[in-house]
């Protein structure tokens, strides 16, 4: 039996959102939209009002909150300008994921263009781990920078910030993680702090970094410092950090993707080339092409490669760095596959799948354990922890399911852990080797308890029912007005009932292609990364949920449904 066959086929159940036909009619009339698109919008809670107008035609001017509403932003901008103009030196310390690296690059690039002396520091994932550390603080002081500006961490770095203060550094923290208590920074920017709530706390570090640039540009009055020119970097973190693509995030992502399509940054041009991305850039291109290559640097070697790539003005250097990131990503994929297969073997050898999955091995590469944990959740729909060994202790990464908060789960198991942190969907921790088995048992027991109160089967929420005859190329183009798509703004999911399976074909030994008919019309239904499905049998009558798309192959265009769920029709 191959490792792929060890993965169970977790079938998704179909749910239909509550329908509001009268509101759909009003939307169709007010905005000249098709009945189908209007039904989707009304099912998502939209009314024919200003909010829907801003959604359909998002603009920077009308759709973004005032920067001055972000607590302490004005003070930070004033102080950074003061330090920059006095040549006192500004050191940026950022995380090694796409959000931290794009946010750090964005602010660094702005400061460089403003003529402010600055430098970027990135922690080493393997020897130092996440967050601000003593080495960075001392290096900042050693190299003559008087301000330490953190991006994507700092909220919980009390000890390191106190050291910075002892060394005479002025500290500014820009972060978006959960706040228990404010850190000892001179200026603290975090929407989650008491008295803030800016943009409902949904902005990632790159988004906050862009807002900092907006505030700085208003004080420096230089055409080269137009904040719109930095949206290509801001959108990278916004999309890859999986924040809700609603409100300000959706506008940053949308305008950023437009900039990215025509970017002149040598690093992004080179990266697009190795990804095979041309003019039209979508969220998928960032999520599955550009993002993984940027992440590969921090996972496999050092995030500093990304800072170099995103900020260089040398096209030849950018080309070399992009190729290096592409190679690192291939290595990351191979390493991920090895760790995933070993984890699957461990789970299979234990018999029944537990409520909480824990897989560990001293040889697991700690740069990919988070991705593998997510793959296990996708396979089994159970909270999953994957652990590797590094620096004399086990380091773990956890991914959860809907209804189970990972950070609360880890908090309940803190007696076994040296450190832990995270949020509802994901978290990380470390523990001593002697505690691993005890942790695995406790993790399963706690998950067993938590899963009694949550759905243990994944589901797909259909926005509306549609007839196959309604699906036309014009409708598919109209549905693109929902883009950019992502967390909090998924692609319109259409429910088509009682279609007959006319034919089934397996493509590249990996993907199912079904020919579906309502008796009059035909459409192809694709189930990606699925070799078989119990409902997809020739002759069956099925209900399907998926995204309508147009597949262009060798110049031929045909309508296609990318299927998320299939059930035998009642």
Label the model's feature ranges:
Residues 520-535:
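Beta-strand/loop nucleic-acid-binding surfaces
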Residues 531-545:
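Short nucleic-acid-contacting surface segments enriched for D/E, G, S/T with interspersed K/R
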Residues 457, 462-523:
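Accessory interdomain/linker segments of ATP-dependent helicases and helicase-like nucleic-acid enzymes
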Residues 554-570:
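OB-fold/S1-family single-stranded nucleic acid-binding modules
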Residues 9, 17-22, 26-147, 167, ...:
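Hydrophobic helix-and-loop "lid/oligomerization" segment in the mid-to-C-terminal part
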Residues 138-202, 206, 210-219, 246:
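Active-site cavity-forming subdomains of large catalytic enzyme subunits
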Residues 359, 513-518, 526, 561-564:
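Short, acidic/hydrophobic/Gly-rich beta-strand patch recurrent on exposed beta strands
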């Amino acid at each position: 039996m191959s490792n792929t066959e060890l993965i169970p086929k977790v079938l998704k159940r179909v749910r239909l959102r509550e329908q509001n036909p009268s509101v759909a009619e009003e939307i169709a009339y007010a905005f000249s939209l098709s009945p189908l698109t209007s039904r989707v919008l009304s099912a998502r809670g939209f009314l024919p009002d200003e909010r829907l107008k801003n959604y359909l035609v998002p603009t920077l001017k009308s759709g973004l909150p005032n920067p001055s509403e972000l607590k302490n932003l004005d003070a930070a901008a004033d102080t950074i300008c003061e330090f920059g103009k006095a040549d006192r030196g500004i050191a940026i310390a950022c995380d090694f994921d796409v959000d931290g690296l794009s946010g750090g690059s964005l602010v660094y690039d702005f400061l460089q263009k403003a003529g402010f002396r600055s430098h970027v520091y990135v922690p080493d994932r393997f020897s130092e781990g996440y967050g601000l550390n003593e080495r960075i603080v001392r290096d900042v002081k050693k190299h003559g920078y008087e301000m330490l500006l953190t991006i994507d961490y700092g909220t919980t770095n009390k000890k390191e910030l106190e050291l910075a203060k002892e060394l005479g550094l002025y500290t500014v923290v820009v972060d978006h993680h959960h706040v228990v208590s404010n850190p000892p920074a001179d200026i603290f920017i975090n929407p989650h702090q008491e008295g803030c709530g800016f943009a409902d706390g949904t902005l990632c570090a790159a988004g906050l970094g862009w807002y900092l640039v907006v505030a700085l540009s208003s004080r420096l009055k230089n055409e080269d410092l137009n904040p719109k020119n930095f949206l290509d970097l801001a959108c990278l973190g916004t999309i890859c950090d999986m924040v809700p693509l609603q409100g300000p995030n959706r506008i940053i992502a949308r305008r950023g993707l437009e900039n990215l399509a025509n970017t002149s940054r040598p690093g992004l041009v080179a990266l697009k080339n190795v990804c095979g991305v041309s003019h039209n850039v979508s969220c998928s291109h960032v999520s599955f092409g550009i993002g993984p290559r940027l992440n590969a640097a921090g996972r496999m070697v050092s995030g500093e490669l990304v800072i170099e790539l995103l900020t260089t003005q040398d096209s030849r250097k950018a080309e070399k760095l992009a190729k290096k990131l592409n190679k690192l990503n291939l290595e990351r994929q191979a390493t991920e596959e090895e760790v995933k297969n070993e984890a699957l073997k461990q789970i299979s050898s234990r018999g029944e799948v537990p409520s909480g999955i824990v897989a560990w091995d001293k040889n697991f590469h700690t740069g990919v354990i988070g991705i593998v944990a997510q793959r296990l959740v996708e396979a089994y729909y159970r909270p999953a922890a994957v652990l590797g060994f590094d620096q004399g202790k086990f380091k773990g990464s956890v991914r959860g399911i809907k209804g189970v908060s990972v950070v609360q789960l880890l908090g309940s198991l803190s007696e076994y852990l040296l450190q832990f942190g995270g949020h509802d969907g994901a978290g990380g921790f470390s523990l001593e080797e002697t505690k691993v088995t005890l942790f695995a048992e406790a993790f399963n027991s706690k998950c067993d308890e938590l899963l009694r109160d949550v759905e243990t089967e994944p589901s797909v929420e259909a926005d509306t029912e549609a007839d196959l005859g309604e699906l036309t190329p014009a409708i598919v183009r109209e549905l693109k007005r929902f883009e950019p798509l992502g967390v909090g703004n998924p692609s319109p999911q259409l429910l088509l009932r009682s279609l007959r399976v006319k034919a089934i074909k397996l493509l590249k030994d990996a993907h199912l292609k079904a020919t579906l008919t309502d008796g009059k019309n035909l459409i192809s239904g694709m189930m990606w990364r699925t070799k078989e499905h119990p409902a997809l049998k020739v002759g069956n009558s099925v209900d399907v949920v998926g995204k309508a798309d147009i597949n262009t192959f060798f110049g031929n265009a045909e309508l296609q449904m990318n299927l998320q769920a299939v059930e035998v029709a009642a």
